[in-house]
Regions:
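Generic internal hydrophobic packing segments that stabilize the cores of diverse globular domains
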Residues: 51-54, 80
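A short beta-strand-loop structural module common to alpha/beta enzyme folds
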Residues: 37-42
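Active-site regions of metal-assisted phosphoester/phosphodiester hydrolases
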Residues: 1-35, 47, 59-60, 64-248
Length: 248
């Protein structure tokens, strides 16, 4: 079994508006994940004290990491990271398309890392989709297409994870769910596992989509006081096994 945790850390600013990288790392450590996918990570930004949050969290967890800047302003970067205790290899990092009619929107990107588990190699693609539905659709199509999910070897174990800013009613979610199985629905027992807002979670907008070669064993979100405080999202924890799913 492999435990994966995806978490929008809101630049490590909690619902109390306090910046605290340490408590974000504490929330993650409490779940003992093998693989961590983070969104909204600040690296060298003045607003969060110039700290490399990806490095700082990875250091506290004893993990290796890869970071992809969705956008860069001079020396300041903001984006997504994948951390793991397992052997890993960066496959690809790059931008996702924006909507041409909304050039002012925040740029988005994706990060692909191959991770060696005891059962074989697992590809993990981490992303954070935009807020505007038309932009989300373009990004979901790109992720499902030949440059990302479609570039993996046929039948290879792969998960696409992150803050999709989309519920099952959204077009972006449906595009991705048509290509892969969403973890909440693929788990043996169906779970709503809402992740936003952390203080009173009602929306499931953080997701894990799994290929046919990945079995979802369990899905959950922690509801302890620290998890509700450390970020405006809750982490989503998914236990996975590598191997083809048994048809229902």
């Amino acid at each position: 079994m492999v435990r994966l945790l995806t978490y929008n850390v809101h630049r490590c600013v909690g619902t109390d508006r306090r910046l605290d990288v340490g408590r974000v790392a504490e929330v993650i450590a409490a779940q003992s994940p093998d693989i961590v996918a983070l969104q909204e990570v600040d690296v060298g930004r003045a607003r969060t004290g110039g700290v490399d949050q990806a490095h700082r969290i990875a250091q506290r967890l004893g993990m290796a990491f890869h970071f992809n800047a969705a956008f860069t302003v001079e020396e300041e970067r903001f984006g997504d990271a994948i951390l793991t205790t397992l052997p890993e290899r960066l496959v690809k990092a790059g931008p996702l398309p924006g909507h041409p009619r909304f050039p002012q929107l925040e740029p988005r990107g994706a990060l692909w890392v191959e991770i060696e588990t005891a059962a074989g190699v697992l590809s993990v693609i981490n992303t954070h989709l935009g807020l505007v539905p038309r932009e989300q659709r373009l990004q979901a199509v790109a992720l499902a297409g030949t440059e990302w999910v479609g570039a993996a070897a046929p039948g290879a174990p792969l998960v696409l994870v992150g803050d999709m800013n989309a519920t099952p009613r959204n077009a972006a979610y449906r595009i991705l769910a048509a290509r892969m199985s969403e973890a909440r629905r693929a788990a043996p027992f169906s779970h709503r596992a809402p992740t936003f807002p952390s203080t009173f979670p009602v929306l499931a907008i953080d997701h894990v989509f799994a290929s046919e070669a990945v079995v979802v064993d369990a899905v959950r979100t922690p509801l302890d006081p620290l998890s509700r405080l450390a970020s405006d999202h809750l982490p989503l924890i998914v236990d996975l096994s590598l191997g083809a799913r048994t048809p229902a």
